[in-house]
């Protein structure tokens, strides 16, 4: 452990030294000395030196406006470098990476050792593996793309420096390159000047595919294949690719008026253009490599006389021509030109697959398997994973938008007001229209702008090549009519295939009603016939936690999944649960392996579909090697969950969870909704108001422009509390509920649940992770600097509650200190705290100055505003998540 960790420490220290030299070159010795003094005070303060803590506060409070920005940038950039070193450490042979590829091998060995499992059963489970990762733009990657690219290059330098065999001049060249990259980062503005548009966000997603996933996915499949061969003597079929990527960028219009039908059409075209671009590069390499002459009669017949001398090249050159013609046509469409479709326009995956697979079969048959299983196999697997669309998109819209559209239509038709009908009347109308052969939309109707947008979105889905759109997600779904309404709107748009329509249940009440809603739907003959035995349901993590607190939300999520699994099993329906998890704990985030094994038994039978959000995409898929590691973790967790499902919870455990849920929800809502001081306290103790100024995502921070916490999106809600280190949404209510149940004499039962039930132990593990990142003295400092004295009592009450929570969780988990079983994460947090603490203190000071100027009616000082934005980005880097 320590030896592994020393490699990380030495990289962090080396990068820190290069950054220090860069600062000295750019701004002189004085600023560097100031930064170094602050760092030493912070380190000593962390070690418990109270005098140095006070000196740290005084030093940061006394910085002049000219010193603010360089100091904030120094610590913020250091944290970005530390995160880069840590990401490299996770894949480095000297660090965590030493055990990464082993994760699949370990799982396969564990499964083989189970007397009740034979190799055939394990093989079947492998063949039914299905993993769909849905990339989303929120909670908005706070780091600019240009800096992410530079950090990727820093990573590459660290990798090469790890090679013992490099000679001195190569080492010197690499160190020079590192100095250049860190200097480039220092002289680059780390804060975007403008909000990204939905198209910018989509391009960011495509960049992840190009820079990491394109190489990472085939390498992961090679790794999986090798482990299967070694442990089961089984090879993956060529056409078996268990992983798919979907995106919400350009498709998610829930609360984001910037995502229109036109934008969705544009992003779909852009995605296809990027796919042709990447496949062209692959085909070019294959044309160069596959110069072989010998081929099967089938391939020779395919290429005819003209291609007999170099059959593989001949076939691939034809494919290259198709790709080029398709790319030119897409380019014209993106520029708004309407050209006739060229012959052989690529719109379906088979058009790519067939010629490539013909080459593969011929090479194998002619004894050239070693060549077939090289670049060609990688390209075939990319066709299966990415294909013509590159990434499919989900369309997401809020349920009320569909209701309003149908209300407008029925009023126009003079048949009443759909919006005011009872649920039974709505269902009767929808089923009647779904069964009807005549169109419902009159040609003469001119709908409002909002309704046109809903109808145009359905039309965009219908016009897209089949397979480009993965699902239609209905947020805030509450009733069967919410689902039927979307099916009707798609029917009216002329859809010719069964697109999965997934209701998203995301508040506590909606999660509790989810099974009733789905049971009613499955009892409708038209619906049962239409879905052809398959149903997708999305479980919302962020909004349910914001609505009821993490303990009540996580239990509602578990129960909803459990009931849905049983209902669908009974009805003979294959259920895919789609998990809308965030990166942060307050929005359902958790280490993948633990999170999946803590779900109800049977929850992964229909595969795993999960959102990968914002900055977590970079941490988990930012490099090809990290992609291999992340996909391997998911694979082993799905296999384990399906073959060795967690136990069904005992009735007594369910009763305790019901109790914990009720107590924690009451306490959480008692503060967040009912305490009149809470919203003013939240607004002043956190940078919530200032976060709106950060040009993060394309989506507004609020669903509605006015209103309190309930109208705020889950992401800024979490982001704000992460900044002031109280991290309140991730724990409020949970510990107090545990305390009450312990007082009722049930501690032994809780300890048993922690030991024997993965769901419960994961909950406590996630609380420990949060507690290791919170900081009571910093949260108190924010109060003193920013909150009116009459609200201090509330802050004190919350901090005392938190202290009690930490004690009770440690007692139930039988741990002497936080993160006892994950020392590597605890070390990592401690290392970053030395650099995050000054940013937090500085942020409180900057908020104080900025708000004071506003109160006095003075013009905001741009140096203060810029430094404030840098501290927000820096703290996010230190905490390893935004929202």
From Swiss-Prot:
Catalytic activity from the UniProt record: oxaloacetate + phosphate = phosphoenolpyruvate + hydrogencarbonate
Domain of life according to the entry: Bacteria
Function comment: Forms oxaloacetate, a four-carbon dicarboxylic acid source for the tricarboxylic acid cycle.
A Gene Ontology term for the protein's cellular component: cytosol
Name of the gene this protein is made from: ppc
EC number: 4.1.1.31
UniProt-listed GO biological process terms: carbon fixation; oxaloacetate metabolic process; tricarboxylic acid cycle
One Pfam family here: PEPcase
PANTHER family on file: PHOSPHOENOLPYRUVATE CARBOXYLASE
GO MF assignments: magnesium ion binding; phosphoenolpyruvate carboxylase activity
Keyword Metal-binding: no
Catalytic residues, chain numbering: 138, 546
UniProt family annotation: Belongs to the PEPCase type 1 family.
Cofactors, names only: Mg(2+)
The entry's keywords: Carbon dioxide fixation, Lyase, Magnesium
Protein name per Swiss-Prot or TrEMBL: Phosphoenolpyruvate carboxylase
HAMAP family the record matches: PEPcase_type1
